[in-house]
Amino acid sequence: MARRAKKMASNSGDSSPEPGIKEINETWKGAIACLGVALLFLMTIGVLYWQVVEKPDTNWVLRGQVSGLVWDKKSLSFSFKSLSQDKTFARIDARHLPVRGGALLNNHCWFNTTRFCHTWDGVANLQVTLDTPNQSVAECYRVEWTPLNCQVALQDCFSMVNTSWYGGGSMRLQYWPINNANINSQPFVISDLQDTPTGYGSVLERYFLGSTGVAVRVHQEVPLHVGIESRKQLCLGIPPNAEMQPLRYTICVSDSLRSAHQQFGTVIPVVQPDQPDTSILRLPHWRSQRVADIALKLEHNLKTFTRKLKLHRLGEGIMDLGEQSTLLLSNEVDETLQSQNRYRGLRQLRLSITLSPFTSIDSHHFQTTLQEGRENLWLGLPSAANGSQGPLLMKWKGKFAVKLNISNEEAQDWFIEQVHSLQRRLEVDYVNLEVGVGSPYVGQAQHHSCRLCGDDYINQFALLAEKLGNGTTVSAATRTAHLPVFVRMVPRQSDWSHAGLKGLIPSILHYSLLGYSFFIPDVIGGSLTDGFLADEELFVRWMQIATFLPVMSFSTPPWVFGETWIVNVTRSCIHRHQTFVVPLLMKYAAEWTSLGHPVFRPLWWVSPSDPNTFTINDEFLIGDEVLVAPVTESGKVHRDIYLPGNSFQWKDMNTAQVFEGGTLLREYPVALTEVAVFIRQKSKYTPAIAEIQQATT
């Protein structure tokens, strides 16, 4: 028994596990389970945190080779950025999108890497198409917003933060850049700034350029409205309309604003254009303020004025006749053949005549066309009685008149013959055409044709002006920068404000950027004044700028101030214009016709990566070689002057001092009888400029 008990005890000990193994296994299992639960908990918390706190507000919706389009759901805005996101070309707020419900966007144009599509239900469809121009490292995007409701007002607003904007329409208060302007959103059409001072003036293009290297061009068929919120946003839009017309524009990005403008802002026609008649540049233009009610009195006034020019040794000039004086001579010449001999002395003068597409209903021309049954020469409306066309009456300079039917080839031929006939009879070469502004059918509810909507009349009238010869000047222009005609600048106030002298250089740069380098500036001292200009300092400072423009125009003769020194300064400015400036303009006119480069250039043209040049509005370049820095502040004989281009050297024409580019000259002395002019040294044009300088001495 004892031995069996001992054996059983021995067997029992052999079958039991090793001490602690079971406890250890259970501990590891519990630890692993706890760790898994903890990881799952942390992952859940992480996902929830990402969803609530860290989820990104932006996403790429379209990518090109050098740039792309980014959507920001928080601000409801799009940004065109470089792929590295170190540069923002443009930030656009889509104001028509709903304020709530912002989310990251998905591309509804499936599997299309060059197009982005998205729909905001009940609001608008968006389609953005990437387009890389041939032989270009830059990229363009065609943007199209289509409203889904006739109550939707489409509006894209481009931020002005860290971006200077240029282009668009001329303004009464002209700024360079346009960031400081403040204009309510309104139809983007040419208007008379005297009647509508907050509108857009005589030169206008649907083109905007940003200092970040971005160019925007709105498609022509868009019924565009443009507004500028000072230093905040430039807004392009379409008001609600029954047709639900889309907002279409193309935005292009490049490495600098100059390259963006050269690639996308310059429109070079297939056929190289002729230059305007540059003979008009050499002689100053004079406008007599004496009123005449008969042709003989007008002739007497002109001859008297011409004798005074010779008396003060101011040389020859072109006498600008207004429309009233032109019609006075035209009617007199028509009335009698004896006028061929009577006004022989008048024909010995150099005259510029002024005409318009308007004809008074009391005039012989209008009555004759009615008698001949040629009512179709004039714009008309269908008659309610029999459906035939009746001439459309409108006001022109206080009188009832009719307007040339520019869409009728017969009317165009008739007008051209009338102008050429008058030129032959008066023996004049230069014609100034006042076109009027706005659509002639505004306010005519029964007229549904859009042949002459917006600025179509102005555009077609400029095409007609080209047929009259390249000595023709038009009072307004759009989409015709390639034509060999001159464009007259808007009238300016006779003061030192941005509506007066301070707005002159911004206007020069604005016209040139849009392609209109051959312009006729307003008269020295401004034409929006009664009688002669009384401020002699304003007259001199204004004349110093005009010396470097295509034409010097006067309505206040220098002798009225009774100061010999003013006459002497005038004589000196005219001489400098004829011997130094005009040859320069001729040189750079060749670049305009072949490359589309502006003749008058902002400082950033030679230093596009220098932000100091983006906002300089009181200096300008002629070509790449001559920098003009006039005084535009009353009572000042010193001014700050910035010389662009770190690798350039600039020589003062007055003192022969040479300065390094990239330098700010503080309080640089500029006497009342002087204007600061600098010549770029060691450039390809330096020898030619030296020859011009030598010829002036």
Curated annotation (Swiss-Prot):
<feature type="glycosylation site" description="N-linked (GlcNAc...) asparagine">
    <location>
        <position position="470"/>
    </location>
</feature>
<dbReference type="GO" id="GO:0005975">
    <property type="term" value="P:carbohydrate metabolic process"/>
</dbReference>
<keyword id="KW-0812">Transmembrane</keyword>
<comment type="similarity">
    <text>Belongs to the glycosyl hydrolase 31 family.</text>
</comment>
<feature type="transmembrane region" description="Helical">
    <location>
        <begin position="30"/>
        <end position="50"/>
    </location>
</feature>
<feature type="glycosylation site" description="N-linked (GlcNAc...) asparagine">
    <location>
        <position position="405"/>
    </location>
</feature>
<feature type="glycosylation site" description="N-linked (GlcNAc...) asparagine">
    <location>
        <position position="386"/>
    </location>
</feature>
<feature type="transmembrane region" description="Helical">
    <location>
        <begin position="542"/>
        <end position="562"/>
    </location>
</feature>
<dbReference type="Pfam" id="PF01055">
    <property type="entry name" value="Glyco_hydro_31_2nd"/>
</dbReference>
<feature type="glycosylation site" description="N-linked (GlcNAc...) asparagine">
    <location>
        <position position="162"/>
    </location>
</feature>
<keyword id="KW-1015">Disulfide bond</keyword>
<keyword id="KW-0472">Membrane</keyword>
<comment type="function">
    <text>This glycoprotein is probably not a functional part of the chloride channel.</text>
</comment>
<feature type="topological domain" description="Cytoplasmic">
    <location>
        <begin position="2"/>
        <end position="29"/>
    </location>
</feature>
<comment type="subunit">
    <text>Homodimer; disulfide-linked.</text>
</comment>
<dbReference type="GO" id="GO:0004553">
    <property type="term" value="F:hydrolase activity, hydrolyzing O-glycosyl compounds"/>
</dbReference>
<dbReference type="InterPro" id="IPR013780">
    <property type="entry name" value="Glyco_hydro_b"/>
</dbReference>
<keyword id="KW-1133">Transmembrane helix</keyword>
<protein>
    <recommendedName>
        <fullName>SITS-binding protein</fullName>
    </recommendedName>
</protein>
<keyword id="KW-0325">Glycoprotein</keyword>
<feature type="glycosylation site" description="N-linked (GlcNAc...) asparagine">
    <location>
        <position position="112"/>
    </location>
</feature>
<dbReference type="InterPro" id="IPR000322">
    <property type="entry name" value="Glyco_hydro_31_TIM"/>
</dbReference>
<dbReference type="Pfam" id="PF21365">
    <property type="entry name" value="Glyco_hydro_31_3rd"/>
</dbReference>
<feature type="glycosylation site" description="N-linked (GlcNAc...) asparagine">
    <location>
        <position position="134"/>
    </location>
</feature>
<dbReference type="InterPro" id="IPR048395">
    <property type="entry name" value="Glyco_hydro_31_C"/>
</dbReference>
<dbReference type="InterPro" id="IPR017853">
    <property type="entry name" value="Glycoside_hydrolase_SF"/>
</dbReference>
<feature type="glycosylation site" description="N-linked (GlcNAc...) asparagine">
    <location>
        <position position="568"/>
    </location>
</feature>
<dbReference type="GO" id="GO:0016020">
    <property type="term" value="C:membrane"/>
</dbReference>
<dbReference type="InterPro" id="IPR050985">
    <property type="entry name" value="Alpha-glycosidase_related"/>
</dbReference>
<feature type="region of interest" description="Disordered">
    <location>
        <begin position="1"/>
        <end position="20"/>
    </location>
</feature>
<feature type="transmembrane region" description="Helical">
    <location>
        <begin position="503"/>
        <end position="521"/>
    </location>
</feature>
